[in-house]
């Protein structure tokens, strides 16, 4: 599984667990400080 596939799978799990509204709010608040962390959480905590 490549990084994009892992991210996509993680996003599906993240949305199923946390709900679309919460995930959408998090994505709207992405910035230089938290962007890489949010991506890492989505790929590794939810996608693996």
UniProtKB/Swiss-Prot annotation:
Q: Which UniProt keywords apply?
A: Aromatic hydrocarbons catabolism, Decarboxylase, Lyase
Major enzyme class? lyase
Question: Which GO terms of type biological process are on file?
Answer: catabolic process
Task: List its EC numbers.
Answer: 4.1.1.44
In its keyword annotation, does this UniProt entry include Metal-binding? Answer: no
Q: Does the keyword Lyase apply?
A: yes
Q: Which domain of life does the protein's organism represent?
A: Bacteria
Q: What residue ranges carry the coiled-coil annotation?
A: none
InterPro entries noted in UniProt:
AhpD-like
Q: Quote the protein name from its UniProt record.
A: 4-carboxymuconolactone decarboxylase
């Amino acid at each position: 599984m490549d990084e994009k596939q892992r991210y996509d799978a993680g996003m599906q799990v993240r949305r199923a667990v946390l709900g679309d509204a919460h995930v959408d709010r998090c994505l709207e608040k992405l910035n230089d400080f938290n962007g890489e962390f949010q991506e890492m959480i989505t790929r590794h905590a939810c996608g693996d």
